[in-house]
């Protein structure tokens, strides 16, 4: 590793002497702040501003991002409420020019009704397998490269979703509708003014998952399944937490397309030490009988305040450069500062 990488790594570790490691999982978002609450109606605003420097082969790239979200709730009665949520993510990668590659991603847009027996929403929301990949997706930057989710199991639009918590059992289910298309007599997609009929794109599907917590033992297990068109997959995961230590594993298997088998597994470990959290993951996946992911990553996260942190993360890419090429087999160093609001 060249001197530039070493210098940046040392400086990133040195500047962060901060205060609070809020748990071992460093990848999630924090709760927002309530800006309005009256007569059973509340509005929370949250998000993050995150500066992220990525270095591969000594070359730098700006992967910085800002997320902003709004959560509104309205109490209908003692056991029923309405909910609406939006989150957008703005990224910038100008390549030395003025606003040439900026983008806005509408990550979530949904509304629904919740109560004693769970919450039902419609819109762009998470499928059911995200809570399973969360078992091992614990790092500030790297990780989660072997448990690939098909579209219907991930964050996608046109989705009817349910989640509920019943004691130690949490369940999620989602169904994505196929998208309507206007087509001509030959089946070609056209504008509605020139259409002969409606069709759909065949992208409907569903996902299911369940997580069970064994009381206060620190042991959790999870399982999930998803199916969409020619794609399907299942996931199994388990974790164990003991005071400041955390261990987890995940296995997934399925088809990413017709006759394209996919198998992957992830291992994760974390340790919380006062002001800091240290995490490590190993990811391995095989697609169509070829190794598509093979890496080991470590990171350290330091908290100045509960909502402000710095981190450094390094991924050792173990793919064979003779098989996948130099670019696809490069290691990566990432340095970041993150402010949550």
Swiss-Prot record:
Highest taxon, organism lineage: Bacteria
GO terms under cellular component: cell outer membrane; pore complex
Membrane topology, as annotated: Multi-pass membrane protein
Gene Ontology BP term (one): monoatomic ion transport
Keyword Transmembrane attributed: yes
InterPro entries for this protein: Gram-neg_bact_OMP, Gram_neg_porin_domain, Porin_dom_sf
The keyword Membrane is assigned to this record: yes
Keywords recorded for this protein, A-Z: Cell outer membrane, Ion transport, Membrane, Porin, Signal, Transmembrane, Transmembrane beta strand, Transport
Gene3D superfamilies according to UniProt: Porin (2.40.160.10)
Localization in the cell: Cell outer membrane
One of the record's GO molecular function terms: porin activity
Disulfide bond entries: none
Signal peptide: 1-21
Family: Belongs to the Gram-negative porin family.
Function, in words: Forms pores that allow passive diffusion of small molecules across the outer membrane.
Subunit structure: Homotrimer.
Record protein name field: Outer membrane protein U
Organism of origin: Vibrio cholerae serotype O1 (strain ATCC 39315 / El Tor Inaba N16961)
């Amino acid at each position: 590793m060249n001197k530039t990488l070493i210098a940046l790594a040392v400086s990133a570790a040195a500047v962060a002497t901060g205060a609070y490691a809020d748990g071992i999982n460093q990848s999630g978002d924090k709760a927002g702040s309530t800006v309005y609450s009256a007569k059973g109606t509340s509005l929370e605003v949250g998000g993050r501003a995150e500066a992220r420097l990525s270095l591969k082969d000594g070359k730098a790239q700006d992967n910085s991002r800002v997320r902003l979200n709004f959560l509104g709730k309205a109490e209908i009665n003692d056991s029923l409420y309405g909910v609406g949520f939006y989150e957008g993510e703005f990224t910038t990668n100008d390549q030395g020019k003025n606003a040439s590659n900026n983008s806005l991603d509408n990550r979530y847009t949904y509304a629904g009704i919740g109560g004693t027996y769970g919450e039902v929403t419609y819109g762009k929301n998470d499928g059911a397998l995200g809570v399973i990949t969360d078992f091992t997706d614990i790092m500030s930057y790297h990780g989660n490269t072997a448990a690939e989710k098909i579209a219907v199991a991930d964050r996608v639009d046109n989705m009817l979703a349910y989640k509920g918590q019943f004691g130690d059992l949490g369940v999620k289910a989602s169904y994505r509708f196929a998208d309507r298309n206007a087509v001509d007599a030959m089946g070609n997609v056209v504008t509605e003014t020139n259409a002969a009929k409606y069709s759909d794109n065949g992208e409907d599907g569903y996902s299911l998952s369940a997580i069970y917590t064994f009381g206060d033992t620190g042991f959790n297990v999870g399982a999930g399944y998803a199916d969409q068109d020619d794609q399907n997959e299942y996931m199994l995961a388990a974790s164990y937490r003991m005071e400041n230590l955390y261990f987890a594993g995940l296995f997934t298997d399925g088809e990413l397309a017709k006759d394209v088998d996919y198998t992957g597994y992830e291992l994760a470990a974390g340790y919380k030490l006062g002001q800091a959290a240290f995490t490590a993951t190993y990811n391995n996946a095989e697609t169509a009988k070829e190794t598509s992911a093979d890496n080991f990553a470590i990171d350290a996260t330091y908290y100045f305040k509960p909502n402000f942190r710095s981190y450094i993360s390094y991924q050792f890419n173990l793919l064979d450069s003779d098989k996948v090429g130099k670019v696809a087999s490069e290691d990566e160093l990432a340095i970041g500062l993150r402010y949550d609001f």
